[in-house]
A protein has these predicted regions:
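Conserved acidic residues
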Residues: 32, 61, 137
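C-terminal substrate-binding/catalytic lobe of Rossmann-fold NAD(P)-dependent oxidoreductases
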Residues: 182-230
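C-terminal helix-rich "cap/oligomerization" subdomain common to oxidoreductases
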Residues: 42, 55, 59-67, 233-261
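Rossmann-like dinucleotide-binding domain that binds NAD(P)(H)
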Residues: 141-203, 243-250
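Beta-loop-alpha module in the N-terminal Rossmann-like domain of NAD(P)-dependent dehydrogenases
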Residues: 27, 45-88, 92-104
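Short beta->alpha connector loops
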Residues: 9-11, 68-71, 93-94, 120-122, ...
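N-terminal Rossmann-like dinucleotide-binding module
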Residues: 1-44, 134, 244, 248, ...
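A contiguous active-site-proximal alpha/beta segment in oxidoreductase catalytic domains
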Residues: 94-148
Length: 261
């Protein structure tokens, strides 16, 4: 199976290729379009370089969208989905709900899978937590994210937290209160019977869920987990998670709006 990749600025192109190398043989990243980072081309000689995203899609069995700029994902996902090519949309899935909704709806309409977001959500540990989440009145999720990052502000790393929140707790939140002080972002996400507190700082730290105890989440083995998930989605053994990601983008929008007040 040949996976095409669009986007080469982030390290995820290499991370995902390394992840595929750890899985049973039979799939690899072939064509790559690096329109977002042409300066990376000299280091990409082990891939088949394409000049356009359309060329990548045509010569691939499925597509990885690896752009840091989430607002570019929807148009590219549309091209792939209309050609019947399953899509993995890297984080951030989108930067507004309308674009996220469009990808989810087109996936449903075409019957072509669309999935993606933070690969931490696909680790066995998170699957186990989803299946047997301790019952608490309050939870806290913490991870690193810089609201002033040159890589798309809080969208790029903050989407880990919104993806994890909607993965673990669903999209049924009814209110969000967010604030930023000294680059520390905190958001209170209110559900009918409990609340989830999201907290990020720019410094390097592992992702942690605080519930009945502290759960250290895996942000290293997550790349193979993400690719294993995508391959299962391509084969239609596992459903994509585009609907959940719409909820994540909705949560992201609410947090960003709160930070602007």
């Amino acid at each position: 199976m040949i996976l095409g990749a669009i986007g080469a600025r982030s390290k995820h192109l290499r991370f995902f290729q390394q992840a595929l190398d750890l899985l049973p043989p039979g799939q690899r990243i072939g064509p790559v379009c690096a329109f977002d980072a042409p300066e990376q081309l000299p280091a990409l000689t082990d891939f088949e370089i394409c000049v356009s995203a359309e060329e990548v899609i045509t010569h691939s069995d499925a597509v990885l969208l690896l752009l840091r700029e989430g607002y570019l994902h929807a148009a590219l996902a549309e091209l792939a989905l209309k050609q019947g090519k399953a899509v993995f949309v890297d984080k951030p899935f989108a930067c507004d709900v309308a674009q996220a909704r469009a990808m989810a709806d087109l996936s449903h309409k075409t019957g072509t899978p669309c999935t993606g977001g933070s690969t931490i959500c696909f680790t066995p540990q998170v699957h186990e937590l989803c299946a047997a989440l301790p019952r608490c009145s309050e939870y806290t999720l913490t991870y690193q994210a810089d609201p002033f990052s040159p890589f798309g502000g809080w969208y790029f790393y903050g989407s880990h937290l919104t993806d994890l929140c909607t993965c673990l707790f669903g999209g049924g939140f009814h209110a969000v209160q967010a604030r930023c002080e000294n680059s520390v972002v905190t958001a209170d996400v209110l559900y009918p019977d409990f609340s989830v507190h999201l907290r990020s700082t720019p410094g390097v730290q592992p992702p942690v869920l605080l519930a009945d105890r502290a759960y250290l989440l895996d942000d290293q083995g997550c790349y193979p987990a993400g690719m294993k998930h995508f391959l299962s989605v391509i084969k239609k053994e596992t459903p994509g998670c585009a609907e959940r990601l719409v909820s994540s983008v909705k949560l992201m929008e609410a947090i960003i709006a709160g930070l602007r007040v």
